[in-house]
Amino acid sequence: KRQALDGEASDDSVEPAVMNENRRPPDQINIVIDPGHGGADPGKIGASGSCEREVNLAISMITGEMLTERGYNVFFTRRDDNGLYDDSDVNKKAADMRKRCSIIEEAQADVVISIHQNSFTDSDVCGAQMFYYTHSAEGKKLAEIMQESFRKFVNTDNTRGCKANDLYYMLIHTPCPTVIAECGFLSNPEEEKQLNDNVYRNKIALAITEAVEKYFGNDSSN
């Protein structure tokens, strides 16, 4: 210890607390959950025939319910298996993506979590991975927190790191920190089975929820 000028002892070893600039109570935070694909767009098809759009929706609804229970304002880009386009749209995929971004803007989202599943030619490849917009520092921060949260709550053996991307439409055209959460590989038979299990889906929802809590400074460490 050293003596302060006013005669009181002070301790140089005590570091000041780091302020979380994003810290706000949950009821002041708008979160958009975006279940990827839908309608005529099935997304990836699993090793045993699982449809990504259905897995995405199931995980999204559980996640949304969990976040709502924590007090957050939750919005969805879709709540059913329909796509976000009109039958008359020539390019349904483009119309769908534009509509998703419109919903996000209308919700005045603070963060967006887009739920997806991965696939690869090598069926041994597995593990969740988060993607963020290359030029978004806050998106990177959220993705890093979420990647670690998946490692903690879903699979401690997952060595993947989050990854920057400047090509995905959803990352480029959203005005707030956005993470595309590739929750696992449907091309891996074991992981496909897990992704269709509600206990495992709840682990994913918990990982996402705890990541959001930490990002906004509402977790137990703050």
What residue spans do the PLM features occupy?
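Gram-positive cell-envelope targeting signals
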Residues: 1-4
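Proline/glycine-rich low-complexity loops and linkers
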Residues: 144-160
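Generic alpha-helical propensity signal that fires on short helical segments
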Residues: 51, 90-92, 131, 146-150, ...
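Active-site-adjacent mobile loop/cap segments within catalytic or ligand-binding domains
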Residues: 107, 114, 121, 158-222
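Catalytic-core regions of hydrolytic enzymes
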Residues: 7-144, 152
